[in-house]
């Protein structure tokens, strides 16, 4: 981890990271810019990504896309997965779904107490960092509203 930017509370961190995917001959080194948001409350663990070919065939490997009722367009455009599908469906309110539908695609992962957000598997430029920061601040607000609605 390098090129770190964070707020004084250390709850909102932007950073560049190098990591490896795969093994042996298929090993690939990845460099990317990520945003980590520490939450003040607990939310369901989930992964949200753009629906693509790999996500569509992952059903054969046992992975299941969680559908959000009355939001078929969202379910076609995004791949949502997590262990507690009922809690995730309850958490993804109409406003949260609309938030994701009306913004550029970002990969978003929640472990329950924090959220990790990134866009592309490469180091972001200044304009992309500003966009990621802006998206993250607005996402943080939306997630807070969702926790108040279900809590």
Predicted feature descriptions by range:
Residues 1-151:
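Charged, low-complexity intrinsically disordered regions
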């Amino acid at each position: 981890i390098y090129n770190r930017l964070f707020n004084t509370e250390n709850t909102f961190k932007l950073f560049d990271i190098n990591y490896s995917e795969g093994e042996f001959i298929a090993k690939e080194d990845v460099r990317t810019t990520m945003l980590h948001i520490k939450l003040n409350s607990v939310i369901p663990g989930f992964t949200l990504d753009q629906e693509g070919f790999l996500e569509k065939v992952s059903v054969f490997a046992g992975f299941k896309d969680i559908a959000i009722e009355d939001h078929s367009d969202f379910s076609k455009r995004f791949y949502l997965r997590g262990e507690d599908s009922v809690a995730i469906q309850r958490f993804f309110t109409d406003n949260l779904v609309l938030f994701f539908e009306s913004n550029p695609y970002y990969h978003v992962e929640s472990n329950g107490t924090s959220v990790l957000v990134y866009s592309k598997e490469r180091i972001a430029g200044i304009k992309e960092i500003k966009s990621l920061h802006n998206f993250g601040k607005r996402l943080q607000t939306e997630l807070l509203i969702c926790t108040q609605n279900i809590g």
